[in-house]
């Protein structure tokens, strides 16, 4: 019995020793692993530095603090001034003018946190991946669009040149031309695109500006092409009726010195304006429903009629004309042109390849309307009036230089109450 107890005791002692040894070894393994993890974390993950083999663009920021990395990237990637070139002049836009900058801090923060995510195992995975391949982060630039627009507007003001049409003034048979000026216009859209491209490609050197030429509607040569009198017509009026005489002067002045380009339409009413006292007209006799009564603007129809006859003989295209309700004292039937503020207007257009010039002159009690143009456009015209009991039909006959009829053009039919 005692011998058996001794045997059991001798058997249990080796087992207990092995267990103790295993426990000691296990504790050592845990301690070593813990130390390795602690050391790994301190040296690689939570050491306050960026992991190895991390780049921003082509700048190696491995094992740097964020502050060190930001300083190094800023040193290598600086925004520069834009030099905008036009006609030998340079216009500078500085980075601070438009808040132009790279997102360096944002990118460095991303690089720093690349191995510092919320997942420990993801961080370990990334660290091991970095031993095989680099991790590259890309910079992006930004700028204030509104400030760029302001800078370009300021430059445009220094470059833009207003376009100026040539001006023609005829007086006493003398032709005086003020030359035209070609305008210059800064192309905002195209120049913005060029600047975007320079910024995005990081080529901050010189940017050629696009400036467009703006041609005048009326060039000097066009104005100078008016070189002769095509036709003119005169009527007389009494200066003793002061209001009427003044209205003729006012309307004559407003329709005069107008250069009409090829295809353009001339409107008598648009030029003379509404007939009111406030608009500079005087009370004078006017025809209303076949009777005479005083109203502002009396007499302006004599101006429109005088101009109409000059238009007929100059070969211009009659677009709109209407006769009076009664035969006027200053023009035969078929040759008068009534205007009012209710839509009756005298309109004509320029059918020629050159401009025409309208001149109206009052000299004492005589009103003269003249149409000037190019000598090549001077027509040979007769006006034919076919009368009937209550009116007349107006025709224009075009002839060649030898007096041979080229064509007959119907103009209008006029009907009168009396």
Regions flagged by a language model, labelled:
Residues 83-183, 188:
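Signal peptide-directed extracytoplasmic domains
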């Amino acid at each position: 019995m005692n011998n058996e107890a001794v045997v059991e005791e001798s058997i249990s002692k080796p087992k207990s020793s092995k267990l103790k040894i295993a426990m000691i070894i296990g504790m050592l393994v845990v301690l070593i692993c813990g130390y390795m993890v602690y050391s790994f974390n301190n040296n690689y993950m939570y050491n306050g530095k960026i992991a190895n083999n991390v780049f921003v663009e082509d700048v190696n920021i491995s094992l740097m603090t964020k502050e060190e990395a930001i300083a190094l990237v800023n040193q290598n990637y600086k925004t520069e001034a834009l030099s905008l070139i036009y006609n030998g002049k340079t216009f500078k836009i500085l980075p601070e003018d438009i808040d132009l900058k790279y997102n360096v801090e944002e990118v460095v923060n991303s690089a720093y946190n690349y191995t510092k995510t919320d997942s420990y195992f993801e961080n370990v995975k990334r660290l091991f991946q970095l031993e095989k391949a680099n991790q590259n982060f890309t910079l992006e630039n930004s700028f204030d669009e509104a400030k760029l627009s302001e800078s370009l507007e300021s430059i445009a003001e220094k470059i833009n040149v207003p376009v100026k049409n040539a001006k023609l003034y005829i007086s006493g048979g003398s032709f005086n031309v003020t030359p035209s000026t070609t305008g210059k216009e800064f192309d905002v859209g195209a120049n913005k695109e060029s600047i975007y491209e320079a910024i995005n490609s990081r080529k901050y050197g010189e940017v050629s500006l696009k400036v467009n030429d703006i041609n005048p509607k009326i060039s000097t040569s066009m104005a100078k092409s008016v070189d002769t009198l095509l036709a003119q017509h005169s009527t007389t009026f009494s200066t003793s009726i002061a209001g009427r005489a003044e209205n003729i002067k006012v309307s004559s002045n407003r329709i005069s010195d107008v250069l009409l380009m090829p295809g353009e339409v001339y409107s008598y009413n648009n030029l003379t304006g509404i007939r009111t006292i406030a608009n500079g007209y005087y009370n004078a006799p006017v025809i209303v429903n076949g009777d005479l009564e005083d109203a502002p603007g009396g007499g302006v129809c004599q101006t429109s009629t005088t101009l109409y006859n000059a238009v007929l003989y100059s070969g211009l295209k009659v677009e709109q004309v209407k006769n009076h309700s009664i035969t006027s004292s200053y023009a035969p039937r078929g040759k008068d042109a009534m205007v009012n503020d209710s839509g009756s207007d005298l309109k004509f257009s320029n059918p020629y390849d050159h401009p025409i010039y309208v001149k109206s002159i009052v000299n004492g009690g005589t009103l003269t309307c003249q149409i000037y143009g190019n000598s090549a456009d001077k027509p040979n015209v007769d006006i034919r009036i076919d009368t009937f009991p209550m009116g007349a039909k107006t025709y224009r006959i075009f002839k060649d230089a030898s007096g041979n009829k080229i064509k007959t053009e119907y103009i209008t039919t006029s009907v009168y109450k009396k």
